[in-house]
């Protein structure tokens, strides 16, 4: 996934957590978050992916050690075509639609996206799904 960039990717997943919904849409949203982390994390950086459940529901978080994002940009990150800065956009490519698609998919699945970031310390994107969206038992 990260190729010659030598990024360390860690996956922590609780077994037996399933969601009701469109597999292709959820896969698209989750992979978008992971690919963004790979794209914006420097060589030798780290990415942590977590999948867990608690009393509130199921959660997926993607945390990276990338450049981070200034707080003034966070409210607009899920707008279509919004870019933090054009110089970063020309370096990394993309359309500016990825996080808008993630937000749309989560809304269709009664979920929400939480974004936290500190410039120079990376970002964390967390998808939260209500307990009602979970499937219990074996699928």
Question: What residues fall within each predicted segment?
Answer:
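Acidic ATP/Mg2+-coordinating residue in the GHKL
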Residues: 64
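Glycine-rich GHKL/ HATPase_c ATP-binding element in histidine kinases
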Residues: 121-123
């Amino acid at each position: 996934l990260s190729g010659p960039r030598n990024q360390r990717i860690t996956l922590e997943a609780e077994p037996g957590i399933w969601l009701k919904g469109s597999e292709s849409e959820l896969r698209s949203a989750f992979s978008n978050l992971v690919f963004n982390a790979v794209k914006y994390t420097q060589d030798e950086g780290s990415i942590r992916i977590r999948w867990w459940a608690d009393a509130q529901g199921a959660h997926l978080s993607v945390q990276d050690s990338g450049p981070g994002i200034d707080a003034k940009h966070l409210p607009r990150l899920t707008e279509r075509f919004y870019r933090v800065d054009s110089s970063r956009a020309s370096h990394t490519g993309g359309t500016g639609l990825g996080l808008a698609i993630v937000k749309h998919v989560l809304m269709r699945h009664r979920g929400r996206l939480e974004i936290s970031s500190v410039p120079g310390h990376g970002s964390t994107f967390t998808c939260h799904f209500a307990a009602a969206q979970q499937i219990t038992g074996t699928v």
